[in-house]
């Protein structure tokens, strides 16, 4: 945002450069991985548009309507939707361990976001967009799990970014977007965000879905606010509060619970 990009433009840049990077990687490894059956496009419309673009749009609208803390907390209702959908679609069991891990994760996110530390108002609009962002976030796990029955992790990730870029660019004022990219600092930043914050996590998460239940994977992904809190403390000098410590412990506890159940 320091370079003048709006939140939606940042999303468009992320997926656009991620698509370019993924294409380069696949051409290097095996160009045949770019081949898909076009009747399977609905899978990638699901991961790219109904999930990636939709949840980002709703997430930013939720922030505009309330606060970052509320938006983040509602976004991380995603594991609930993943687990509910997985019961019907993949016949995954909703065990006591999963329920405990889910509660521990949600409570941990509540403490880390500091939602109770200040006076905040939750409007119906903010709640609606926040909950929608959680549903959109959850859909990536569902559509990816379905796509993994037919396609390689690299293929799924690449086509997710292709379809996301097609949907996001028209909404991101492309003329202004590419004008701002003339700044070398903005270009380097966009490439870094695409590689570190988009390609790497989506590749790893999609690969993880091959070996882990969608519900478990969605809970493990809630490490994100914990990592964000740690970066804020150690790099940006944010205060380490009792609430944050408790939140981190709760999120780590959910991973311990899932690991214990697996063993």
What are these regions (language model features)?
Residues 47-56, 78-79, 113, 133-141, ...:
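Transmembrane alpha-helical core positions of polytopic small-molecule transporters
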Residues 9, 70, 93-98, 155, ...:
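Residue-level recognition of membrane-helix boundary sites in multi-pass small-molecule transporters
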Residues 4-5, 66, 92-94, 151-152, ...:
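Membrane-helix interface residues
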Residues 12-13, 52, 56, 70-77, ...:
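Helix-helix packing/entry segments at the starts of transmembrane helices
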Residues 22, 85, 94-115, 168, ...:
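Hydrophobic transmembrane alpha-helices of multi-pass small-molecule transport proteins
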């Amino acid at each position: 945002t320091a370079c003048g990009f709006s939140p939606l433009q940042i999303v468009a840049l992320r997926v656009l450069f991620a698509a370019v990077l993924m294409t380069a990687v696949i051409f290097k490894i095996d160009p045949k991985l770019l081949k898909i059956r076009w009747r399977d496009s609905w899978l990638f419309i699901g991961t790219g548009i109904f999930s990636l673009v939709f949840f980002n749009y709703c997430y930013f609208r939720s922030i505009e309507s309330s606060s970052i803390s509320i938006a983040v907390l509602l976004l991380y209702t995603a594991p609930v939707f993943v687990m509910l959908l997985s019961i019907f679609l993949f016949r995954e069991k909703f065990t006591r361990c999963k329920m405990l891990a889910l509660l521990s994760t949600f409570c941990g996110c509540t403490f880390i976001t500091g939602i109770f530390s200040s006076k905040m108002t939750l409007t119906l609009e903010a709640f609606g967009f926040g909950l929608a962002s959680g549903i959109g976030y959850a859909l990536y796990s569902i559509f990816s799990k379905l796509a993994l029955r037919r396609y390689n992790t690299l293929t799924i990730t690449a086509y997710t970014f292709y379809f996301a870029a097609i949907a996001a660019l028209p909404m991101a004022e492309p003329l202004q977007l590419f004008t701002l990219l003339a700044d070398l600092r903005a270009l380097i930043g966009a490439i870094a965000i695409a590689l570190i914050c988009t390609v790497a996590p989506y590749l790893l998460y999609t690969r993880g879905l091959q070996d882990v239940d969608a519900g478990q994977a969605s809970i493990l992904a809630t490490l994100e606010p914990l990592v964000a809190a740690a970066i804020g403390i150690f790099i940006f000098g944010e205060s380490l509060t009792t609430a944050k410590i408790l939140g981190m412990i709760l999120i780590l506890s959910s991973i311990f619970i899932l690991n214990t159940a697996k063993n």
